[in-house]
Amino acid sequence: MDEGGGGEGGSVPEDLSLEEREELLDIRRRKKELIDDIERLKYEIAEVMTEIDNLTSVEESKTTQRNKQIAMGRKKFNMDPKKGIQFLIENDLLQSSPEDVAQFLYKGEGLNKTVIGDYLGERDDFNIKVLQAFVELHEFADLNLVQALRQFLWSFRLPGEAQKIDRMMEAFASRYCLCNPGVFQSTDTCYVLSFAIIMLNTSLHNHNVRDKPTAERFITMNRGINEGGDLPEELLRNLYESIKNEPFKIPEDDGNDLTHTFFNPDREGWLLKLGGGRVKTWKRRWFILTDNCLYYFEYTTDKEPRGIIPLENLSIREVEDPRKPNCFELYNPSHKGQVIKACKTEADGRVVEGNHVVYRISAPSPEEKEEWMKSIKASISRDPFYDMLATRKRRIANKK
C-alpha cells in the first residue's frame, strides 16, 4: 500500500506526521515554482540580450556602412575628385559648403595629394572658394616664408599646370601677407620670392643639377623684387640656409609636379661669347642652362658665374658671323635695340648690369649649335608659368 507515497517531488517518508508531510510537500511545491521562475527569468534575459545584440549590430552595421561609404567616397575622389565630393555630399557624409569640403581635403586622410592639388587649382567658382577656405586653414603667423611653404606644400602636391599653380600660389601669398603684415611690401613680392625658393630647393637638391647656386647668387637673383627695392640680405640668407640644410618634403604621389616642371632641358658645355663692350672680343666661357637662365663661368670649377642671363622675354635665332662659325643670338623681340636685362660680375667682385643688346654665341660644331638652340628654345617656351612670373616681376618694376 502506498500511503501518501506519491505526490509532488517524489515519495514522502512514512514516519512523518501528517502536518510534517504537508509542510514538506509545500516546500517542494515552492521549490518547483522557484525553479520555474528562474527558468522563465533566464528565458526573458536571453530574449533581452538577443534584442541588445540586435540593436548593437544594427548600430555597428550603420557605422560599418558609413565607414564603407566614406572609404568609397575617398576612392572615387582619387579617381575623379568632383564625382567623389558629389558622392560624399549625396550620402550625407559631407556638407556641401566650401568650408566643409576644404576641411575634408585639409585632413587629407586616404586622399591622393596630387588629386587634392588638381582639385584646388580648378577654375570653377566653387573650387576657388574651396581653395580660399583651404588656405585659411593654414596658420602662417610668425613663420618665415620657408617654414610657411613647408607647411603649405606638404598638404597637397602642386600640379604642373601653370594657371593652377598661379591661383594656388596667389592664394598662398595673400594668406602669408595677411598672417605676417609688414614682412613684404606686396603679395607680388611674396609670390615671386616663393617661386625663387621652390626653384632654389630644386637647384640645391636635384642630383641632375650640377651647378649649385650660392647664397650670393640667390640674393643677386632676387634684387629689386620688393616694390622695386631690395629685401633685407639677412632675410634672403636665412631663407637660403633653411632650404640648403633641409629640402622641402614633397608628397610622393607621381612625377607630375612643379619640381619636374622646372628642370630638365638642362645643358652645359664650352661656348664662345662675343663681348658687349666697345672692343668686341670672343671669350671662351663654360655655359650652364638651368632654371630658365643661362649662366656662364670662366672655369668649370668656379663657384660663382661671371654672368647670368634670365631667358624670360627673350628669343633665339641662328646668325651668320664672318669671324666665327655655328653662331646663334639671344635677343628681345619686343624691344629691339634695348639692353637685355642681365648681370655680370666684374673682376673686383662687383655685380653690375649687362650691356648687351644681343648675346652672340658660337658653338664648337653645327651639331652642338643645334642642340643648344633646341634646349634654349625648350627652356624659354616649355611652360607658360615663366610668363606669369615675368608678369609679376614687371608689375613690381612698374611700381617703382
Curated annotation (Swiss-Prot):
Residues 265-381 form the PH domain. Keywords: Cell membrane, Coiled coil, Cytoplasm, Guanine-nucleotide releasing factor, Lipid-binding, Membrane. GO terms for cellular component: adherens junction; bicellular tight junction; cytoplasm; cytosol; plasma membrane; ruffle. Present in all tissues tested, with highest protein levels in brain and adrenal. Its main location: cytoplasm. Residues 14-61 form a coiled coil. It is a peripheral membrane protein. Gene3D superfamilies: 1.10.220.20, Arf Nucleotide-binding Site Opener,domain 2, Pleckstrin-homology domain (PH domain)/Phosphotyrosine-binding domain (PTB). The keyword Zinc-finger does not apply. Residues 77-206 form the SEC7 domain. A 1,2-diacyl-sn-glycero-3-phospho-(1D-myo-inositol-3,4,5-trisphosphate) binds at residues 273-281, 285, 296, 306, 355. It is found in: Cytoplasm, Cytosol; Cell membrane. One of its GO terms (molecular function) is guanyl-nucleotide exchange factor activity. GO terms for biological process: establishment of epithelial cell polarity; Golgi vesicle transport; positive regulation of cell adhesion; regulation of ARF protein signal transduction. SUPFAM superfamilies: PH domain-like (SSF50729), Sec7 domain (SSF48425). Residues 392-400 are annotated as: C-terminal autoinhibitory region. InterPro entries: PH-like_dom_sf, PH_domain, Sec7_C_sf, Sec7_dom, Sec7_dom_sf. Promotes guanine-nucleotide exchange on ARF1. Promotes the activation of ARF factors through replacement of GDP with GTP. Interacts with TAMALIN. PANTHER family: CYTOHESIN-3, GUANYL-NUCLEOTIDE EXCHANGE FACTOR. Binds via its PH domain to the inositol head group of phosphatidylinositol 3,4,5-trisphosphate. This is Cytohesin-3. The lineage of its organism: Eukaryota, Metazoa, Chordata, Craniata, Vertebrata. The gene is Cyth3.
